[in-house]
């Protein structure tokens, strides 16, 4: 059980820093990933940024320069969070959770943030001058902290013994998930269940729960397949175009799952990319596969890739969701393996730190963060090479995004704190 200490007592005492130790392997790997990200964001946006002029104002409009600023802010956040005993967050988790819910409600108010907050029909961002804030990213941190707090304060064992805790967890994770889905932002919502389930697993919840959860997941997949099949039947029966008549099935009276037509289209383009509008729905993934396949062993050279430079891989996604495809084309198999190796260092080190944690709280936090990063890495790269449908999940520390980068730094700072305070230096 977590020792009862006041939050103030868990804040850093810089006079004792020489007595603690830092895990240097993870931050070095994260720094390398950040540098790679900046380099290939620059490459992916090169043809766009060349005409933006010079000077600070022009630089602030360039994604690669803004990414450097995001990494700088994130680095400061990483160090600050690492210096604080991770047990401090147990006392403020509920306040942090409530604070993170506020922008999730705000972003749903029509017109509250202006047109800049609405992209591709989704309200996911709150504009802040030349930057924007994505509330769903901080919501992931809030769910992590509240889940960790509930698990260490509760008795976890059989499903019957854990029902009360599971109900609280479902509510704590369910509220932000619903708000995120309403934006709609499926990609940010689907990463929460694996994170929570991994934290439940390390808390030694009965295997029967996970067997039941697996069964429910398989039923959900079956329901999605059934819904998508009915969607195809409806569109063909009514002479609708999968690319032009978006929203037609959503507005129909047929019984259906609460999915958007563009999400169904992504599933169809994944299952049969040659049949379902390969030049529309399936364009991004087809161009991504061409990028990865054309890189060879060592690639075409930095800034020399044709898919992103000529716009075949759309510039709107090349620097974020599909940046791994840019890396694979320009640096080939060797560059791809390097990126995977760096992520492997971060993820395996996260598991190692969880195993050396001083208490269950530290283990739960480290495993939760590692699981969250694992989902991001696996789904993003699998999406890039055509193993899963397009979801838009970004690649940590490499994909462009301010809120995402800073939140990733905060989460890794928590893992570093678990390592630093694995022993009591008081």
Regions picked out by a protein language model, each given a short descriptive name:
Residues 94-95, 100-101, 166-179, 186-255:
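Hydrophobic alpha-helical segments of polytopic membrane proteins
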Residues 190, 195-209, 306-335, 393-401, ...:
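Interfacial segments of multi-pass membrane proteins
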Residues 105, 140, 197-198, 374, ...:
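Hydrophobic residues within the alpha-helical transmembrane core of Major Facilitator Superfamily
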Residues 350-391, 398:
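Loop-to-helix entry and N-terminal half of a specific, functionally important transmembrane alpha helix
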Residues 117-125, 212-333, 360:
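Hydrophobic, glycine- and aromatic-enriched re-entrant/interface helices and adjoining loop segments
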Residues 164-169, 213, 364-372:
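Alpha-helical transmembrane segments of multi-pass membrane proteins, especially transporters
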Residues 68-77, 330-347:
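Hydrophobic alpha-helical transmembrane segments
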Residues 2-33, 39-184, 244-247, 381-394, ...:
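Membrane-helix boundary/helix-loop-helix interface segments in multi-pass membrane proteins
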